[in-house]
């Protein structure tokens, strides 16, 4: 789990997301509170529950981007889901319980990777010995039995040196590695998930312990053997328990598009993917126990962050019980032309930086002047005002139009230096800057 302070988390988010200080502060405090809670002693630790967050704001202002960046910072089990993908229990479609199952699978991968890294040094040594055994098969005695290998022979040490220096990387060898598990996906009828999990485990156990001969280059064989040896050093039952603990204590669920499951108007028919889904979400958010193939998972201390544009519906259209379980509300503001200017230049891997790097692969040096950045931002802002406001995503459309000619001709422009200034932008985006013909920029 991340031990970053709220100020450090906000600073990290600032490198990728412009503005939205309130939203950044809210998620930073929530993430830090996860760490604070773990410093408490029982039984007080059990009593401290997470304060779930509802982020409200128009499309394209950074709600989903905050979730993406948070996933990298959290160093904890994290899953982002779309609320519209789920249906009420009893109908065809995904049930909300699958969120926790997917989160547990994510935790298994995270914990497994951590354990592999812990054992990597030992696994590398064992993999190296296996490669050397293949290159220098141990001798057999007069009865055909393999003699105990001597790891310190001169020949073996010479080969070990060559192996570590990469001199043998392109040589092909045949090795025995564990056969991959049979991946079987079974769609379970409602209420029969436990049987499905047992069937999946049965199919996976069919291939466990089996090995497969594969021919590959030594550099690829080493990677495969390191993973193979590291997997042998991991206790599967201990891994499951660590993953379940990680989900229960540090898990974070980000539910996007929650406004799309709000009930609109007085509609009395079956509400399979709206109010029914909200009611199914209630026990998860409040705290319940979900059966997964790795074991039972309690959701009492999982942090839920929901977000939605709420352009048609309002937060008050959510059922009251769910509103009460999302106590922290953060409003994200619409982006201005000044924000667009900052988005084009300030974040790590900004749009202008991306296009410069792409054109550099063709030997073309691109330079954006301040006036060009200002004109691009104004053009994107104007299109958003006159048509559908899709926030920062509009910049992608405008930039593609601006760079269209250069991108097409770049392969014949090697060695050239192109300066994109205000006049160039006006010429390329003239139909939006002067004539306000916006049809080219509507997605």
Curated annotation (Swiss-Prot):
It comes from the Bacteria. Pfam families: AAA, AAA_2, ClpB_D2-small. Keywords: ATP-binding, Chaperone, Cytoplasm, Nucleotide-binding. ATP binds at residues 18, 60-65, 256, 321, 393. GO terms for cellular component: HslUV protease complex. GO terms for molecular function: ATP binding; ATP hydrolysis activity; peptidase activity; proteasome-activating activity. InterPro entries: AAA+_ATPase (IPR003593), ATP-dep_Clp_protease_ClpX (IPR050052), ATPase_AAA_core (IPR003959), Clp_ATPase_C (IPR019489), HslU (IPR004491), P-loop_NTPase (IPR027417). ATPase subunit of a proteasome-like degradation complex; this subunit has chaperone activity. The binding of ATP and its subsequent hydrolysis by HslU are essential for unfolding of protein substrates subsequently hydrolyzed by HslV. HslU recognizes the N-terminal part of its protein substrates and unfolds these before they are guided to HslV for hydrolysis. A double ring-shaped homohexamer of HslV is capped on each side by a ring-shaped HslU homohexamer. The assembly of the HslU/HslV complex is dependent on binding of ATP. This is ATP-dependent protease ATPase subunit HslU. The gene is hslU.
